[in-house]
From Swiss-Prot:
Annotated signal peptide: none
Positions of transmembrane segments: 11-31, 53-73, 93-113, 127-147, 160-180, 188-208, 243-263, 276-296, 314-334, 350-370, 387-407, 418-438
Pfam families xref list: MatE (PF01554)
Disulphide bridges: none
InterPro entries: MATE_fam, MATE_MdtK, MdtK-like, Multidrug-R_MdtK
One Gene Ontology CC term in the entry: plasma membrane
Species the sequence originates in: Escherichia fergusonii (strain ATCC 35469 / DSM 13698 / CCUG 18766 / IAM 14443 / JCM 21226 / LMG 7866 / NBRC 102419 / NCTC 12128 / CDC 0568-73)
Protein's recorded name: Multidrug resistance protein MdtK
UniProt GO BP: sodium ion transport; xenobiotic transmembrane transport
GO molecular function annotation: antiporter activity; xenobiotic transmembrane transporter activity
CDD domains in the cross-refs: MATE_NorM_like
Phylogenetic lineage: Bacteria, Pseudomonadati, Pseudomonadota, Gammaproteobacteria, Enterobacterales
Amino acid sequence: MQKYINEARQLLALAIPVILAQIAQTAMGFVDTVMAGGYSATDMAAVAIGTSIWLPAILFGHGLLLALTPVIAQLNGSGRRERIAHQVRQGFWLAGFVSLLIMLVLWNAGYIIRAMDNIDPALADKAVGYLRALLWGAPGYLFFQVARNQCEGLAKTKPGMVMGFIGLLVNIPVNYVFIYGHFGMPELGGVGCGVATAAVYWVMFVAMLSYVKNARSMRDIRNQQHSGKPDTAVMKRLVQLGLPIALALFFEVTLFAVVALLVSPLGIVDVAGHQIALNFSSLMFVLPLSLSAAVTIRVGYRLGQGSTLDAQTAARTGLMVGVCMATVTAIFTVSFREQIALLYNDNPQVITLAAHLMLLAAVYQISDSIQVIGSGILRGYKDTRSIFFITFTAYWVLGLPSGYILALTDLVVQPMGPAGFWIGFIIGLTSAAIMMMLRMRYLQRLPSAIILQRAAR
C-alpha cells in the first residue's frame, strides 16, 4: 500500500501544475470570447466560428508532438540523457513542417466558413480575418509544445504552468490594444483577438525556450553536440508514435462538433442546454486529462529504468486516483447541477434540460476519466496505434451511431433529443474505457523483456 501512496504523491506533484496550465489555457479562450463580445456580438460569433476550425487543426499538431513526452521520459529513466537533445531538435523540425501544413489549411478555411448555411457575409469575413491573424501563431504554439514536452518528459511540469499564466496575463492587455486600437495600433475588433493570441503564443515559446536554455537541471542536455539537420529516421519514428494520438484527438474534437451540428436543428432550448452541460463537463475533464499526462511521464520513466512492475504500479495508481477524482466531480455535478446551470442561463426550460443532462454527465465523467488515463498509460508504453483504433471504434462506430439512433429516430425508443446523444457519449466513452483497460492488461502480461524492447524503440 505504501508504494501506491508514494506513487500517488509523485503523480499529483506532476499533475497539479498541468491542471493549472490547462486552466490558464482555457481562461485565454474565455477572455477572447468575452472581450470580443464586449466589442460586438458579431465579433464574438466570428471568434467562436474561427475557434471551431482552429481547434481541430492545432490539436492535430499538438497530438503529433505528444510522442516526445514518453520518448524523453524513457531516455531520462534509462540514463541515456545524451540522446534527448537530438530528439528535441527533431521535434522542432517536425513542429515546423506541421505548422506550415496547418497554416495552409487555415488560410484556405474561408471556403468552409462561406459554405455554411445562411451565414452573414460580414460575419464570414470577420471569422476568416480572425483565422488569418491567428494562423501566424501556429508555429509559436507548436514550438512551445516541443519545449514544454521536453520539460514534462524530464518530470518538470511547473514551467508549463508558469508560461501558461504568463500567456494569460499578456493576452488581456494585448487583446485590449488590438481589439480597440490603442497605442497607434489599428482597431480590429474580433480579428484583434487573433492577432493578440498569435503574439501570445510566440511570447510563451520565447519564455519557455529561455527557461530551457538557462535551467541548471538541463545543462548536460544543452551541452550535447549533435547535428541540427533533420533526421528522417527520428522524425519518422516520432510521426509513427504521434500520428495515432493526433488522429485520436481529432476524432474526439470532431465528434463533439458533429453532435453540436446535429443538435442545432432541435431548437434554442435544446442547443443551450446541451452546450451548458458540455461546457461544464469540459471544465471537469481538465482533471483526468492532466493526470493522464502525469501517468505517461511516470510509466515512461519507470520503463526507462527497466522496471515493468513499477510501471504497473504507476498505471494502477493513476487509475485509482482518476476514479476517485471522477467520483468527487460526479457527486459535485449531481448535487449542484441546477445551480451550475444558473451560472450560464436563467431560462427555466434551459436550466431544467441542462440539469437533466448533467445527471448523464456525471456518469460520463467516470468513463471519461478511465479512458483518458488509459490513453496516457498506453502512451507511456509507446502503444499509440491501439489508441487510434480504440478511439475510432468507440466514438464513431459505437458512440455517435447509438446517440443518433436514440436522439433523432424511433428505432429503439421515441426520439430523446440531446439526452440521446449524451447516452451515446456514455456508450462510446465506456466502450473506450473497457478497451483501454483490456489493452493495458494485455501489454502488462507480456514478458518483461518484450515490454522493455517495445518501449525502447
